[in-house]
Amino acid sequence: MKKIKIGQIGIGHNHASEKMAAFRRLSDFYEVVGVVESDPEWKERRGNLPQYQGLPWLTEEELFQTPGLEAVAVETDGFDLLSTAQRCVDHGMHIHMDKPGGEELEPFRRLLDCFRQKHLCIQLGYMYRNNPAVNFCFKAARSGWLGDIFEVHAVMSRYDGDDYRRWLSGFKGGAMYIFGGHLIDLVISLLGRPQKITPYQRKTRDDNLYDNGFAVMEYPRATASIRTSVVEIDGMKHRRLIVCGTKGTVDICPLEHHSSRYHLDPLHVRLTLKEDNAEFKAGTHDVVMPVMQGRYDLQLTELARIIRGEIANPY
């Protein structure tokens, strides 16, 4: 089948280089035509990464004028994701846009409306949507194995130094703004729109960064807790999703691996059941997931299938 011609705008996002690595691995689906980076500082810092070796560096206009271009990965450093995405939809492009979707809801809503009106795909960089351990959790919940869900606990933290802290302080929401969306996305997939959200923002240092975030999402018969920080030592190993119901619990920890470990280490799910079901007996099980080839491969494969018309956009 014909490959999808795709380019990348921006290399400043922390996910940008590994996204490019995934696009290049997925050569049955994609032909990468080039990279755009208008900020000389980002090009100096990251332009020589191996993920970009051998690719042409283009201006944005040169990228949009590439014959047969169908899609763009928007990987700017976070402050102009929406404006870049808007230029892409104006040029008739499908996009993968890294998160978050801006600090205000209305501009993001208007952007989504543009994609709907033009029947173009916008895929957001919430990679846990295609995580096999998370999808096993969703299956357990939607199949009724867990009964009525009454509690969700989700954690996504890491440790970062001064340079990242200075960059992150440019966003009003701090760590919760950058990381919380991943977790809120999971909770809404499980429980829907909450009745109320109460945030608790804290600073562990006397600087301008909310580096320790906590939020409670309230439902008629359930609560969900969201925790994010950039001060937890080896925090990636402690990323976690726990879903508790009246008939069972799913516990995923770690929620993911470092990018270098995906193809080596399968994720594990701790499943505890009150009753037998068609696949598992009552009791506690260590369920081993299939090995992933990379953090983003499944999601970007899904994007290709959406663009080709093989599946509808599930989001």
Residue ranges of predicted features:
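N-terminal Rossmann-like dinucleotide-binding module
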Residues: M1-P50, A304
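Beta-loop-alpha module in the N-terminal Rossmann-like domain of NAD(P)-dependent dehydrogenases
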Residues: Y52-C114
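Rossmann-fold dehydrogenase core element
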Residues: R110-Y128, D148-V152
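Short, Asp-centered acidic motifs that coordinate Mg2+ and/or phosphate
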Residues: G34, A71, E151
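A short helix->loop->beta-strand "cap" motif at the edges of active sites that frequently abuts
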Residues: L55, H91-M93, K118-L120, Y219-A222
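Contiguous beta-strand/loop segments that form the cofactor/metal-binding neighborhood of enzyme cores
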Residues: I184-R261, D297-I311
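C-terminal helical cap and adjacent loop that interface with cofactors, partners, or active-site loops
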Residues: L273-Y315
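Predominantly a Rossmann-like dinucleotide-binding segment in NAD(P)-dependent oxidoreductases
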Residues: Y128-D206, F214
